[in-house]
Amino acid sequence: MSIALWYCPAPGTLDYEVLKTLINSLQLLVPGSPSFEPHLTVVTHLQVQNRGDVSKVLQSCSSCLKTIPKGHSLIKYSNWSINKQYFKKIVLECEKDKYLLSLAQLMRELYVEIEDQKRRAEHWVIEEFQPHVSLMYNDSQITKATEMVVRQRIHDAMQLFSNNPSSKSWRTFKVVSCEGPVEEWQVLGSVTL
């Protein structure tokens, strides 16, 4: 999967604790599902070679966030779904917030689509970028009975923050090496704003 840019709720916040508990509880329903930190993947395939490059990515994220109106939340859940893809087996779908889209497009222009970046990044953000928070990574088929339990657990979790995560919770960017098994992924750098 390469190197990714994650946007995360800060540990200890309601959003982090609710999502982490939800991820762990769903993991118990389907054997072989790894545990991972709550996050929204902004972009993958970052072109970073060293710590200096990681710092530039995080500095760019920090600068972008400063342009967003205070109190505005980039993360707003719109739905949830079960999919066939391993990394999107169960997800909370997020609205395509204009600031989130701008952030994703800019990061892709600067650090992924190095050549002919603007046109490709514009196409990607409109046609391919599906903002979401993964709740499970797995290849297994989800049974109807498990789906009913998943539905109830997600519903219960969403009631805790009324489908509106606090803009104060989501404030950490991480550059993550996503090579090998999920348990071996490494955070190369992070910034909390």
Swiss-Prot record:
It comes from the Eukaryota. This is 2',3'-cyclic-nucleotide 3'-phosphodiesterase. One of its GO terms (biological process) is cyclic nucleotide metabolic process. GO terms for cellular component: Golgi apparatus. Involved in the metabolism of ADP-ribose 1',2'-cyclic phosphate which is produced as a consequence of tRNA splicing. InterPro entries: Cyclic-nucl_3Pdiesterase (IPR012386), Cyclic_Pdiesterase (IPR009097). Its EC number is 3.1.4.37. Belongs to the 2H phosphoesterase superfamily. CPD1 family. It catalyses: a nucleoside 2',3'-cyclic phosphate + H2O = a nucleoside 2'-phosphate + H(+). It is found in: Golgi apparatus. It comes from Candida glabrata (strain ATCC 2001 / BCRC 20586 / JCM 3761 / NBRC 0622 / NRRL Y-65 / CBS 138) (Yeast). The active site is at residues 39, 132. One of its GO terms (molecular function) is 2',3'-cyclic-nucleotide 3'-phosphodiesterase activity. Substrate binds at residues 41, 134, 137. The keyword Hydrolase applies. Keywords: Golgi apparatus, Hydrolase.
